[in-house]
């Protein structure tokens, strides 16, 4: 009886916490994978490069994902490269130095050599954290209900990434990022069951994407790092295609200077996801 009461209390507290959250929470899907999970009660915050500007927590780092998850952030954009051993790993830069100790082009290094280095935070401080393997990040996110937007470094095999996502049973928790129509079509061919982020900054780009034959329910629209015309957000909402606004850079700086209330104003245009370097700033 006592155990039942405690379990009920914990579930109730969880529901209240979600309702009181300042950002949107993604509702998991089990069987059918559609973009409707991103139409939450409130806009969803997605941490660019898995979290930037946080002392002691580097970008593209599993421990940063774990830290932000505890703070209520559950969507993360990460960058994928491949070592000479064929292991998929996380890093944005082509070379070591800025975000990790050591020197060298990461795609020309072995996994063993890369794992010897340590990640640095955005302030140049060395941490004890290793460059993460994608499989470890996928496994943790699967277990803890975190969602990933996967950005491919040049030359990465789409099918290899898709196979690893499937192996870790993360198909329902990823978005594959494309930057042009041909890339979107290629991703759809190798992973038709997964969601795909497509660049849609205007009506013309929307029309070209709709002509590809990619299922509409698999699309997530990246509308750029500047505000698009209000009519585009209206149209995307009519089509039930969730939109991402990349506030990273210019718009984040504007909000920092003029006030974080701007995120809420932008959300009212019909934006479902904010990709930001300031994950704690947006409040909805």
Name each model-derived stretch:
Residues 18-284:
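Phosphate-group recognition and catalysis centered on beta-loop-alpha active-site segments
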Residues 1-28:
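Bacterial Sec-dependent N-terminal signal peptides
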């Amino acid at each position: 009886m006592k155990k039942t009461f405690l379990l009920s209390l914990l579930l109730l507290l969880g529901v209240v916490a979600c309702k009181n959250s300042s950002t949107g929470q993604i509702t998991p899907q089990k069987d059918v994978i559609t973009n409707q999970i991103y139409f939450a009660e409130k806009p969803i915050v997605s941490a660019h490069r898995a979290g930037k500007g946080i002392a002691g927590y580097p970008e593209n780092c599993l421990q940063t994902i774990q830290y932000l998850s505890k703070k209520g952030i559950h969507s993360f954009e990460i960058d994928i490269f491949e070592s000479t051993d064929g292991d998929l790993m996380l890093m944005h830069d082509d070379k070591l130095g800025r975000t990790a100790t050591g020197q060298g082009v990461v795609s020309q290094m072995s996994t063993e050599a890369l794992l010897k280095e340590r990640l640095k935070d955005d302030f140049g401080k060395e941490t004890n954290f290793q460059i993460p393997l994608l499989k470890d990040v996928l496994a943790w996110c699967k277990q803890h209900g975190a969602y990933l937007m996967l950005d491919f470094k040049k030359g990465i095999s789409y099918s290899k990434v898709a196979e690893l996502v499937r192996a870790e049973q993360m198909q329902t928790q990823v978005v594959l990022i494309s930057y042009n129509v041909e890339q979107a079509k290629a991703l759809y061919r190798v992973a038709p069951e997964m969601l795909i982020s497509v660049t849609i900054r205007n009506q013309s780009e929307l029309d070209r994407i709709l002509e590809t034959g990619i299922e509409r329910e698999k699309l997530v629209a990246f509308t750029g790092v500047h505000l698009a015309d209000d009519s585009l957000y209206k149209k995307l909402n009519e089509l039930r295609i969730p939109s991402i606004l990349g506030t990273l850079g210019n718009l984040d700086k504007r909000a920092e200077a003029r006030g974080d209330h701007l995120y809420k104003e932008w959300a009212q245009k019909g934006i479902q996801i904010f990709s930001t370097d300031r994950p704690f700033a947006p409040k909805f």
